[in-house]
Amino acid sequence: MDLNLFRYRWDGDKYQLHYTVSQLAPYAAIRDWIRAGLDLHFRKDHRVLETIISIFFILGSLVSTLAGASTEYQAINCRKHSAVLTDFGGVGDGKTSNTKAFKAAIAELSQYASDGGAQLIVPPGRWLTGSFNLSSHFTLFLHKDAVLLASQDEAEWPAFPPLPSYGVGRDEHAGRFSSLIFGTHLTDVVVTGNNGTIDGQGAVWWDKFHQKKLKLTRPYLIEFLYSDQVQISNLTLINSPSWNVHPTYCSNVLIQWLTILAPVDSPNTDGINPDSSSNVRIEDSFVVSGDDCIAVKSGWDEYGIKFGRPTQHLVIRRFTCISPDSATIALGSEMSGGIQDVRAEDITALGTQSGVRIKTAVGRGAYVKDIFVRRMTLKTMKYAFWMTGSYGSHPDTGYDPKALPEIKRISYKDIVAENVTYSARLEGIENDPFTGICISNVNISLTQKPMELQWNCTDIQGVSSKVTPQPCSALPEKSIECPFPEDRLPIDDVKLQTCSASG
């Protein structure tokens, strides 16, 4: 597949997304690339497949080309000092390990943190590397023809203990491998480019997962812990071993202009997972994934309850998802630190299992509340709405069966869904109902063979207005418009600077 299909162009004062007729040639390649996975779900219904692929042309905002070899980029801060990976012995032949070169470069450049900061430029080439850690007041910049290739040698991936809010590793309880691009306790860190590529070469990890040969939990592509002022932007991420982007215990996080691609049958290749983080903005991005395109998290059962750090003040806008077995935006299921004040708007999903899905269970505790969604366009979906109070497993037997999650004030409005099998599956918890659900101005058109029961509702309470098909009796019709906050969050006011990676 020609990854140049997905490009953003700097137009002087902001990124714009473009495509031209000459770029339609990759259409067949993309179609074939996705078909292998989608055919498993759509029974070789190429009419459905063509509808899904039409996203690349219907939404010009997702198909573009960066102008030439421009070295300008947008960042939260520019850097006074600059170096190129080849200055530290980097070899971009796709075979030579560059882990030592990355570590040497970052160690050298980190000394400028208090003197205007530094940037490391990754030039054109194929740069094989294992895990490496970034530093504060630092920018990693990938040239448009640069490809970072994640090493498949486990020796290049240090072992870490489990995250404290999870208690155990997700794949294997013993712990986890470090992420490819990693950092902890950082301030002002940027990973960007003019749409360079990070290739996780995940197939070997997916095979180990399926064959139960993993000793530790698989690595992620980009992960920051306990960090503030984080930017991840204008990159293409492909074939991650597991999750792609994972800001955890972070604040003031800006994620934008990402293209994330993985086979739709690849295990746990979530796109963007904000985890126990606050003041986060995700926008102008596109994900094809084997799992949730965005999964909002905050810790697992008793470990998340004890750690007690919520994900809150999260903005998601202008986001597109393809994921046949998962959600466009998932809340949970690991939500034991709480999730509050999520604002999602202008969301598109094609060939995806569900729009916004709330996932929780007895033992999770905490809350999911003040969730606001508006202006969603959904095509070829199993569910338009899905909430479940019986999702997922527990890390161990130490969870508290009396720890019931509180799910309330959930607002959906201005949604159009086409070719839908079930309108809604809304399942709360016995003696712990999900309350304050509001659904308004929603039009759902059904597949040719819809399920007879369109609204399956148990242990929920709420209202609806102008919804087709008619909702269940637990959502009685009222003359209301569901709320959506009109105030701005601090992350909305973050201004970007025009920087140079001329090296």
Task: Kindly give the residue locations of the regions a language model identified.
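Extracellular/periplasmic carbohydrate-active domains that bind, remodel
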Residues: 2-13, 18, 26-503
